[in-house]
Each structure stands twice: as C-alpha cells, then as structure tokens.
Amino acid sequence: MRFNGFHAATLGILAAFVAVPAAAKTISVSATTPDANEKLQEALILAEPGDIVQLGAGVWKLVDGLSLDVPNVTVRGAGAGEGGSVLDFTGQQGAGEGLLVTSDDVYLTNFAVLNTKGDGIKSKGADRIVYHQLRVEWTAGPKETNGAYGIYPVESTDVLIDSVYVRGASDAGIYVGQSKNIIVRESIATENVAGIEIENSYNADVHDNIATKNTGGILVFDLPSLPMQGGQNVRVFGNEINDNSTPNFAPKGNIVASVPTGTGVLVMANRHVEIFDNVFEDNGTANVMIVGYRYEHKDPKYQPLPKDIVVRDNQHGKAGYAPKFAGGDMIAAAMGGSIPPVLWDGSGDAIVLDKVGVLSLNLPDVKTPQSEAKPSPADLSKGTPPAALPAIKLPDAMEAKVR
C-alpha cells in the first residue's frame, strides 16, 4: 500500500510538472547577421505563447513577407524611427503583406515597415490585437502602385491602434474592417487616400488623431456584399482634421477612388455616428460629408442610407472653397465662392448642431443620379439626437501593454 501511495503521489507530481507551461522567453533577432531575414521569420515561427520577439536596431532588407500565427506573442523593436528597427520591403518579390498576423493576443510595437507591395501590417481574425508605436510608410510619397493599407486589422474583436504613423497608402492608412470594439487613438495619418477608415464595423472610438494631407481625413463606411454589415456606433472625436488636399491616387475601381479631394470626415451608409469636438481646417470640399451608398449592388439585405448621424461641438475653419465633386465648382460659384462646411446628399437622416451652414443636394433616393441634384441650404438642427454612445472599453490587459 505504501508503494502504491508513493507511486500515485509521484505520478501526480509529474503530471503537475508537465502541465506547467515553459517560461516565456525573449528571442532576440539582429539585423546585421548574414542570415538576418531567415532568423527573423524563424523567430516568428518558433515563438511560443508568452514569448517576446525582440528586434534589434537596424534595417532588414526583405524580399518576402513575414507571418505570425502563434497567440500571445509580442513583437517589439528598438523604435519606429530611422535609427530603430526597420523592415524594408522595397525589394519585395511578391505582392502580399509585409507582416500578416492570424493569431490572438498579439502585441506589435516599436518598429517600422516600409514600401510593401501589398498591405503594410495586416491582421485577420486576430482578437485582442494591439498596434502601438509603429510606422508604416511608402517613402516615395503618394503613388497608385503603393500598397493599399498601412495598418489593417480585419474580422477581429477588440482592436487597439495607438500612436502609429502611416503615410502613402493607396487606399487607407489606418483601416479597420468587419470588426467590433475598436479604438484608434493618438495616431497620425498623412498623404494617404483615406487617412483613417472604419468599415462595416461596430463600436469604434476614433479620437485624438491627426488626419492631414490625405484625400479624405476620416471615413466611416458600410458597404454591401460583405459578411459583416450594418456598421454602427462609431464616435469620431477630438481629432485634428486639416488640409486634406492630396489628389486621389487610388486605383480605379476602389470605393475610395470616389472620395473627393478635400474631404474632412465622410460618413457613408452607417448608423449612429457621432462627430464631435474635432478641429477642422482647410478642407477644400467639406469638413463633413454625409451620404448614402449610390452605387449599383445586388445585396438584398444591404441598407444604403446614413441614419442617426450627429455632428456637434466641432471647430470649423476654412472649408468648401474647392469642392471636388460633380458640379461642385458651379455650386460654389453660385454661393459666393464656397459651399458650407457640411455637405449632405439628402438621404437618410442627420442632426447638425454646429453653428455652420449645411448644403443639401436633395437626393433622398440613392438611386437618383447626382446629375439631378437640387442643391440648397438645409437646417438639420431640429429633432432629438439619439442617446449618446458610451466610450469603448477594451480589456485591461490590452491597455496595460501600452501604458
């Protein structure tokens, strides 16, 4: 009996020992070794949950994209500036992403991604992902051949994008699609077609960012024929949205190719969007545009109208002096040289409490061609705004990573 008891106890101890995961480790990767590129991808493959892949200072000249499919991994560089950790894809042979993440609880911080043929950093189906202090840039400036998206999480729950810089994306610098529970904050988007875009997503706070010198500063879209529809509950607040004057360089056929140069915030077919406490300045078409989806589609479930849009407590500087939509120049001339800061196509509903003018195109039916517009001033200050949206709260563990 004593033997059996001892044996059972020993087995219990061994079982407990086996159940304890290996201690998290730091995998350091240098940019200066002859096999630096291979070692970097190897580190991402061999990492285990809890590990840190530490990138040294230097430049990796990469010809292939990188991938990470291990959960709960941190990829940390030595900084996102020129003297930090730089992943340079100028010589990339394929057309894919620079870095693709497909696992949960990943933390990306303090490195740069340059000149990818495709998207800069993409995550797909990666819940609780954190993008922090990153730089994604196409260094030759705006070009149609640049990658589409800089920072690109899609199909995710709980997304935090904090203190990133994106320049030169031919679609959107910072894009979050088909996701829910999102915060985009304290970031800079410049010289992209769309600076920041929230598309077909639920529950997003976009705040304290700078969107400047894009074609359009911040876009909130809902599009047809996607698995997740009914985009709603988005707050755009506390942002500086100025001088979005870059000519549209999106490839033809992209939905953002229709964004007029000089757009501050553009809401298309979304529901319950609050735009408040922003500073607008020098957006040649409009500071705020609210429109329906006016393109052909074959999705019977799609709802193309903007609803419950609220615009309040914003500061409006110069706007509407160079409207880049069909007939905009003639409308501006007829109105003394510029159109009001807020432009509404007349579809859906919105409340504008800012003490500025609103121009309606009086096109309530999205099937009516824009050529039939009958522009006139509109008063959208009446009515009762919907209940204010709550702040987005992400898991404490995500916030702790960036503190």
For the regions a protein language model found, what residue spans apply to each?
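Right-handed parallel beta-helix/beta-spiral solenoid domain characteristic of secreted/periplasmic
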Residues: 28-38, 52-54, 72-117, 140
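Short, T/G/N/S-enriched strand-turn elements that build extracellular solenoid repeat scaffolds
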Residues: 38-46, 61-70, 75, 122-125, ...
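Extracellular beta-strand/beta-solenoid scaffold signature
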Residues: 37-41, 63, 89-99, 115-122, ...
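Right-handed parallel beta-helix
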Residues: 50, 78, 104-115, 127-140, ...
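Acidic, glycine- and Ser/Thr-rich low-complexity intrinsically disordered tracts
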Residues: 296, 301-403
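Bacterial N-terminal signal peptides that target proteins for export
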Residues: 1-10
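N-terminal signal peptide c-region/cleavage motif recognized by signal peptidases
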Residues: 19-21
